[in-house]
């Protein structure tokens, strides 16, 4: 049964690295995903790179000093892997998820089978 089940966990937002005026952190771009199951091509981090965590560094976007990460992949690309694994034909991906037309790589590749 382990090869027939995938558990997908996500967060809908990210946080800035630098606290806001009230000592909390502001909403930022991006999110985090975890996928578990027998068909997951696991023990890897997916994406082009892990961003620099330096305030004002090369990966700090927006105003360049708060610690905003720019996402490395779309949630649509992540969902595409799960949809393909569930049996959606590849030629139907952009019909089901029209935003995928904006990306050269349509899926991430974390599912086997």
Residue ranges of predicted features:
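Feature marks hydrolase-like catalytic cores characterized by long aromatic- and Gly/Pro-rich stretches
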Residues: 1-113
């Amino acid at each position: 049964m382990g090869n027939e089940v995938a558990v997908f966990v996500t967060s809908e937002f990210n946080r800035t690295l630098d606290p806001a005026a009230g000592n909390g952190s502001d909403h930022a771009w991006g999110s985090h995903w975890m996928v578990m199951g027998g068909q997951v091509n696991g023990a890897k981090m997916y994406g082009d790179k892990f961003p620099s965590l330096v305030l004002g560094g090369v990966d700090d976007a927006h105003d360049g000093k708060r610690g905003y990460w720019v996402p490395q992949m779309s949630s649509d690309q992540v969902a595409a892997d799960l949809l393909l694994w569930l049996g959606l034909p590849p030629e139907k991906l952009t019909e089901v998820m029209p935003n995928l037309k904006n990306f050269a790589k349509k899926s991430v590749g974390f599912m086997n089978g």
